[in-house]
C-alpha cells in the first residue's frame, strides 16, 4: 500500500477549504527504515494529511526508504514514494532524496528484531540526518528513532530522550551518543530537534512538528479537527 495522502479522508465538502495562493508549501520527508513502527509512521502521515486536507494548510510529505517496498514491524509491507540514494552514488539526481528539497525530516522508531538498527545506523542515514541538521531544518523522531539521530552525532550536548522502558537501556545508549537524556519528559524539544520516549507520544510529536512548520494556532486547530483534547 502507498501512504501518500491516504490520511484524513473524512471529507470536507468541496470548496470548504481554500489554501492561500501565497502560502509556501512545507514539505516533510517521512523516513521508513526497515522494521519501522506503523503506529509512529502513521501518526506523521495522519497529522500532516489532516493538516492539508481538513486544515487547509500548505503541508505535504514524501515517504522514503532504502527499497521501494519496506517491511515494517510485524512484516506489514509499505510502498514508499522515494528510494534513498546510496553512499557513493554521487550528487543528487531526480530520483535521489536530498535534504534541500524538504523542510523537515520525520523518523519513526522501530524494532531491532525486524532490522531497524541495520538501517538506522547506516552511514547513508546519518548523512541525511546531518544534512537536515546543518540546514537548520526540524527533525522529529519518535521512540528509538532518536538513536538514529544520536548515531549521526547531532545529539551531542543536546537534550533528548528515547524509549524509556525495558530497564532504560535505550536511554543509556542515547547517553553514550553524548545526549543529555531527560528521563522524566515524554517529548523533548531542543531547538529544531524533537525526540520522545515511546509509541504513545506519536501524535504529540507529529503535532509538535506541524507547529514548527506552521504555527501553534494552526497545529491546535488541526488537533481539534482530529478530536484531540487540548492536553493530548
Task: Please annotate each region the language model reported.
Residues 160:
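Anionic-ligand binding patches
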Residues 3-11, 15-137, 147-156, 167-169, ...:
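Extended, subdomain-level signal for the structured scaffold at the beginning of enzyme domains
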Residues 189:
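Active-site anion-handling motifs in enzyme catalytic cores
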Residues 164:
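N-terminal Rossmann-fold cofactor-binding loop
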Residues 142-143:
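Short, thiol/selenol-centered motifs that function as redox-active sites or metal-ligating centers
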Amino acid at each position: 500500500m502507498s501512504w501518500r495522502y491516504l490520511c484524513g479522508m473524512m471529507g470536507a465538502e468541496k470548496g470548504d477549504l481554500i489554501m492561500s495562493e501565497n502560502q509556501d508549501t512545507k514539505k516533510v520527508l517521512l523516513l521508513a527504515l526497515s522494521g519501522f513502527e506503523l503506529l509512529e509512521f502513521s501518526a506523521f502521515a495522519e497529522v500532516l494529511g489532516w493538516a492539508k486536507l481538513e486544515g487547509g494548510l500548505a503541508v505535504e510529505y514524501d515517504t522514503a526508504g532504502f527499497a521501494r517496498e519496506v517491511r515494517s514491524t510485524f512484516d506489514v509491507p509499505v510502498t514508499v514514494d522515494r528510494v534513498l540514494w546510496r553512499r557513493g552514488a554521487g550528487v543528487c539526481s531526480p530520483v535521489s532524496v536530498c535534504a534541500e528539497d524538504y523542510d523537515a525530516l520525520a523518523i519513526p522508531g522501530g524494532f531491532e528484531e525486524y532490522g531497524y538498527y541495520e538501517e538506522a545506523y547506516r552511514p547513508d542515514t546519518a548523512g541525511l540526518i546531518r544534512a537536515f541538521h546543518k540546514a537548520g531544518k526540524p527533525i522529529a523522531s519518535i521512540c528509538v528513532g532518536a538513536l538514529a539521530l544520536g548515531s549521526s552525532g547531532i545529539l551531542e550536548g543536546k537534550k533528548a530522550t528515547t524509549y524509556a522502558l525495558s530497564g532504560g537501556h535505550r536511554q543509556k545508549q542515547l547517553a553514550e551518543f553524548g545526549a543529555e537524556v531527560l528521563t522524566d519528559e515524554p517529548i523533548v524539544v531542543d531547538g529544531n530537534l524533537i525526540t520522545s520516549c515511546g509509541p504513545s507520544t506519536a501524535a504529540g510529536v507529529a503535532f509538535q512538528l506541524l507547529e514548527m512548520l506552521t504555527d501553534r494556532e494552526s497545529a491546535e486547530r488541526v488537533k481539534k479537527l482530529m478530536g484531540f483534547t487540548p492536553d493530548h
